From Swiss-Prot:
Binds 1 zinc ion per subunit. Belongs to the class-II aminoacyl-tRNA synthetase family. It comes from the Bacteria. Catalyzes the attachment of threonine to tRNA(Thr) in a two-step reaction: L-threonine is first activated by ATP to form Thr-AMP and then transferred to the acceptor end of tRNA(Thr). Also edits incorrectly charged L-seryl-tRNA(Thr). The gene is thrS. Its main location: cytoplasm. It comes from Mycobacterium tuberculosis (strain ATCC 25618 / H37Rv). Its EC number is 6.1.1.3. It holds the Pfam family HGTP_anticodon. Residues 1-20 are annotated as: Disordered. SMART domains: tRNA_SAD (SM00863). This is Threonine--tRNA ligase.
Length: 692
């Protein structure tokens, strides 16, 4: 008989995610977890899998060959939730094949906050289908089917078993390392069978590397959320499948909190608000991922850009412009066509000349839409001789670039094909490099805070060993400098191994929005390679020639993406200084329109965007309409207001300030906007002369 499982030497119990347990050879991990007194079902911290000494996640049914230290993984951890979600995806696939026997299986990985599974079915799934599937899934969960790992004896055995599953067959030999391919990638080719808990007969199974929870009863709470079309493996050249999304959590309470979060996120969805607030659209006639901004959206965008221009001018940047297309040779020089061609639109072959008989007189050449501005900024630097006295040279451009994003990943304004980058490139000496990076990071953080984003951490992206240009020692120096500057900022610095672009390591500023979601925002990239590739030089004080250091920086990332993020951060209620309509006058009756027009004219003289609603709607309906359209200041006037030369403020939270002298009201609004207050104005926050 095996000795009882014990905590590993030097480590006591406590938090299961921090404990280590020794599993005797020939004993299941589940037995060791149970003997250690850790919960195995029914609580949010129940142990669902374990991590072995090599860091691999293992089923609780795993039996090591030798005494082994393991770390229990609880349901309420990231890894625990991921396993629960993957197991729930299997339950979904089982339900689909029971209710839709003709369905062929794609892939079904866990994803952030949920899971999905792709199916080849004749017709799209309907909401009624999802309800029926969820009902069957609950029955499967209640049955307590066992997840049983089975090793295929050979790939031939796997192919024979999967003969009627064409997509699974394709995965048997997959070597892509794609994180979303859960079917293969382990040391062995395995399947997970769902077994009847009483008879242990196989009910259903799937090609899968695992791990999984012990039984379907270990799925505490789940919900199917939606379905959509999706290309097999994300490639539009492949078959179009139907994808069902869902979510699963360690408790019903956690699921309920998540569903509330999803509801709020949907309310803030910039794609929805873009239509409701008449900000932007994506006409089919133009194409996927190509936005047009409407007048109201254009105002917000102009304000974003104008404030940025002002701050860049104050910081010593010089403004440049570059064309949208260029000869292919430029991107051969930069390396983009070697390392980034898949992200570029196809070339335009032009400039060929022909004789009258149709024979070629002058060959044409390829032109590309630019995916980045940096090569052109290198040419601007190289356009004339440069002295050390000019450095640091800070070039800035709102440059529109084009990237061939797959249609399946295009998403509103946050993932587009045509985007305008607030692109800066700084050329400096190596002696100036650290100070320039420090001031640049401070500039980025301060400017983001001016737009109301203040919760940051940093991510350091380092070299991809398979995809980089330049010498190893140059990369090491650049990475070390960025790490030092990031650490000096006092912000958390998270490593991102292999995440750098091909030409240099980078620091990215990660921002949390009002819902606590993280967005990659600004990037600061140190580059010793482009100056070498483009032959950039400056003359030092002693007359010798040197290569400058180049720093790439995009503060917003892109105007479009930043616009989308801000829209969701503020739920469409932009700060008054950004709002397309800052003030609307609402008359009690028609006879008060002329008075409010005078107030609006007074506001406009101070640069305030003011309108008067002279429609036939009743005042109450006008208030509801402009509240829904997120106008920060509503100014009301009736007989008493006109007689007293006053107005009343009405705010979106339904608070009100009555009888404010007209000049005082104008002064309060002008001051609020001039101060660039990012809060939503309320009766409590707005300061009016003579009122405490």
């Amino acid at each position: 008989m095996s000795a009882p499982a014990q905590p590993a030497p030097g480590v006591d119990g406590g938090d299961p995610s921090q404990a280590r347990i020794r599993v005797p050879a020939g004993t299941t991990a589940a037995t060791a977890v149970g003997e250690a007194g850790l919960p195995r079902r029914g609580t949010p911290d129940a142990i669902v899998v374990v991590r072995d000494a090599d860091g691999n996640l293992r089923d609780l049914s795993w039996v090591p060959d030798v005494d082994t230290d393991i770390t229990p993984v609880a349901a309420n951890t990231d890894d625990g939730r991921s396993v629960i979600r993957h197991s729930t995806a299997h339950v979904l696939a089982q339900a689909v094949q029971e209710l839709f026997p003709q369905a062929k299986l794609g892939i079904g990985p866990p994803i952030t906050d949920g899971f999905y599974y792709d199916f080849d079915v004749p017709e799209p799934f309907t909401p009624e289908d999802l309800a029926a599937l969820e009902k069957r899934m609950r029955q499967i969960v209640k049955e307590g089917q066992l997840f049983d790992r089975r090793v295929y004896e050979s790939t031939e055995q796997a192919r024979a078993e999967l003969a009627n599953e064409p997509y699974k067959l394709e995965l048997v030999d997959d070597k892509s390392g794609d994180a979303e391919i859960m079917e293969v990638g382990g040391d062995e080719l395995t399947a997970y069978d769902n077994l009847n808990p009483r008879t242990r007969e196989r009910v259903w199974g799937d090609l899968c590397r695992g791990p999984h929870i012990p039984t379907t009863k270990h799925i505490p709470a789940f919900k199917l959320t939606r379905s959509s079309a999706a290309y097999w493996r994300g490639d539009q050249k492949n078959a179009s499948l139907q994808r069902i999304y869902g979510t699963a959590w360690e408790s019903q309470e956690a699921l309920d909190r998540h569903l509330e979060f999803i509801e709020e996120a949907q309310r803030r969805d910039h794609r929805k608000l873009g239509v409701e607030l008449d900000l932007f659209s994506f006409p089919d006639e133009i194409g996927s991922g190509l936005a047009v901004f409407h007048p109201k959206g254009g105002i917000v965008r102009r304000e974003l850009e104008d404030y940025s221009r002002r701050k860049h001018t104050e910081a010593g940047y010089q403004f440049v412009n570059s064309p949208h297309i260029t000869k292919a040779q430029l991107f051969h020089t930069s390396g983009h066509l070697d390392w980034y061609a898949d992200g570029m639109f196809p070339p335009m072959h032009i400039d060929a000349e022909y004789n009258a008989d149709g024979s070629l007189r002058k060959p044409g050449q390829d032109y590309y839409l630019k995916p980045m501005n940096c090569p052109m900024h290198c040419l601007i630097f190289r356009a004339r001789g440069r002295s050390y006295r000019e450095l640091p040279l800070r070039l800035f451009e709102f440059g529109t670039v084009y990237r061939y994003e797959k249609s399946g990943v295009v998403h509103g304004l946050t993932r587009v094909r045509g985007l305008t980058m607030d692109d800066a490139h700084i050329f400096c000496t190596r002696d100036q490099m650290r100070d320039e990076l420090r001031s640049l990071l401070r500039f980025v953080l301060d400017l983001l805070a001016d737009y109301g984003l203040t919760d940051f951490y940093l991510e350091l992206s380092t070299k991809d060993p398979e995809k980089f240009v330049g010498a190893e020692e140059v990369w090491e120096e650049a990475t070390t400098v960025l790490a030092e500057v990031g650490a000096e900022s006092g912000l958390e610095l998270v490593p991102d191994p292999g995440g750098a672009a091909f030409y240099g390591p980078k620091i990215s500023v990660q921002v949390k929005d009002a819902l606590g979601r993280t967005w990659q925002m600004s990037t600061i990239q140190l580059d010793f390679n482009f100056p070498e590739r483009f032959g950039l030089e400056y003359t030092a004080a002693d007359g010798t020639r040197h290569r400058p250091v180049m720093i790439h920086r995009a503060l917003f990332g892109s105007i479009e993406r930043f616009f989308g993020i801000l829209t969701e951060h503020y739920a469409g209620a932009f700060p008054a200084w950004l709002a397309p309509v800052q003030v609307v006058g609402i008359p009690v009756a028609d006879e008060h329109v002329a008075y409010l027009e005078e107030v609006a004219t007074q506001l406009k003289s101070h640069g305030v965007r003011a309108e008067v609603d002279a429609s036939d709607d009743r005042m109450a309906k006008k208030i509801v309409h402009h509240t829904n359209h997120k106008v920060p200041f509503m100014v009301l006037a009736g007989d008493r207001d006109v007689a007293a030369g006053a107005v009343s403020f009405r705010f979106g939270d339904r608070t009100q300030i009555n009888g404010v002298a007209r000049d005082d009201a104008v002064a309060a609004i002008v001051a609020w906007i001039a101060d660039r207050e990012n809060a939503v104005p309320t009766a409590e926050l707005v300061k009016v002369a003579g009122r405490e």
